[in-house]
Each structure stands twice: as C-alpha cells, then as structure tokens.
Amino acid sequence: MSDRTAIIGDVYSAFATGNAERLSTLLGDTDWVEAGGMPYGGRYRGFGEIAANVFGPINTDVQGFNAAPDEIIPAGDDRVLACGTYRGSGAGGEVAAPFAHLWTVRDGRITNFVQYTDTHLFRQALGQ
C-alpha cells in the first residue's frame, strides 16, 4: 500500500468511527466536490464546510450510513481511486449506491476529492 492510499484509507476509518478530530486533520483545506445530483451536492472547501454540508446532513438523513470502499488504488502520480457502495437506510428505504471517489494527495496532504455515484438511488432511499 502506498503512502497516499494509506492516507485515504485513514479517512474512511476516521469517518466510520466518527473521529472528527482526525478527519479535520486529514481534510484540513481539501477542495471537496460532492456530485451535483446529490442532496448535499456542491463544492466545499475545508473540513468545516465539508462537515456542515455533507457529513452532518448525511448522518442525520441516512441511518447507519457507511461509505467503506471495497478497494483503494493508486491512480497516477498523486491520485487515488476508492470504489465501493454507500449503505444505510433513509425515509424511502435502504440505500445501496455504488461510488467512485477520486482523491488527490500531494506532499502527504489531501488536496482534492471528487465524488461519482448513482444519485438517483441515493435520492430514492431518502424518499426524494
């Protein structure tokens, strides 16, 4: 496992355990792009905006939310691709939406995140 894939693995571990302090350190000033069709879609900068606009609402809307990747692979000099399935349950039922997350890690720091997912499946689970 490369250093950059280990860093990204650490993000998913911190999210799964609710370790906001670690997430704040890892995501610091990250440029975060949540898919436009998502209820939380948009561009956010830094952990504060990400937590307020994505992490907080998603944990409120989706019981048992889990974004554990099935694989984390290096993709080029400074990119990492994580693929998996979002799981949990919302007002409209269970969610099982595949995702691909493209991360950029430069000099040991996460600089960018872009989300790709089936937003329709996610919205269905929320009853939207």
Identify the residue ranges that each predicted region occupies.
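Short, low-complexity N-terminal intrinsically disordered segments enriched in polar/charged residues
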Residues: 1-21, 25, 29, 127-128
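A solvent-exposed, acidic/Ser-Thr-rich amphipathic alpha-helical stretch
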Residues: 25-76
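Hydrophobic/aromatic beta-strand elements that line small-molecule binding cavities or substrate pockets
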Residues: 67-73, 86-87, 98-104
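A short, polar/proline- and glycine-enriched secondary-structure boundary/capping micro-motif
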Residues: 92-94, 122-127
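A short hydrophobic beta-strand element
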Residues: 76-86
